[in-house]
Amino acid sequence: MTMAEASSPAGDTAAGTTQSLMRVRGLQKHFGEHAVLRGIDLDIMPGDRIAILGASGSGKSTLLRCLNFMERPSAGVVELAGQAIVRAAPGKADPDRRTYDEAELTRVRQRIGMVFQQFNLFPHMTALGNVMEGLRTVRGQREAEARTRARAELARVGLADKAEAYPARLSGGQKQRVAIARALAMDPEVLLFDEPTSALDPELVGEVLRVIRSLAEEGRTMLLVTHEIGFAYHVANRVLFIAEGVIHEQGTPDQVLKNPTQPRTRAFVDRHREFDF
């Protein structure tokens, strides 16, 4: 595989379709003079389970945050279900300035769920209240309807008995499962996981990975930034290795994790040989 092939969008899909759910072309993100993303091209197909690997500072988390516009891309095109989200409007003083329709971004974020490293639960709300919040304030659902849906999502992640518990009374793994339930309640078309186990004690990692695995088995479309290489091998249908803000190599788990073609990918994988592929 050449570097050009390594950086091109993969044609293999989970659903066997050529219609992208999300399409990314030339995505860049700059913080001042520092380029974090330097031209990402990516097609996300329905049912894709994409694991994103790379060293710290490579741009993995920034990519996810640009995909749901928590960070505004500096350049490039992002499409969701064939509709462009990015609105380029070069300004006279700053030709790289980009403007966005805030109402449109709010609608987009409802369709792209995100689960963070640090849970981000409201401490003054119960687990049930945290899951209900988006349904009430964003979706405008009535309390009874939101409560029913929130309880169902908590049950899905194995926390039906913790509905009335406050975050301070939950373990890290339980907090992360509440965060996953909160994302699922909004019926996202794509789920983004930003190192969801990195803040957990080792003994709590498994309970979160089991939930993510079950979502993958349901056919959920997801992107997962993770250092759990063995988990990525068994759950993902595609693996991206990002280095210095570009997709350095991509392919199936066997291609990238067992038979990488790029020296940098190979060095990264060799550091994780203790994992059972």
Model regions and ranges:
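Catalytic Walker B motif of ABC-type/P-loop ATPase nucleotide-binding domains
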Residues: L191-D194
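Conserved signature/switch motifs of ABC ATPase nucleotide-binding domains
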Residues: A165-A168, M186, E218
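Helix-to-loop junction immediately C-terminal to a conserved catalytic motif
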Residues: N68
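Short coil-to-helix segment of the ABC ATPase nucleotide-binding domain corresponding to the Q-loop/switch region
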Residues: M125-E133
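ABC ATPase "signature
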Residues: Q250-G251
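Conserved ABC transporter NBD signature motif
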Residues: G76-A93
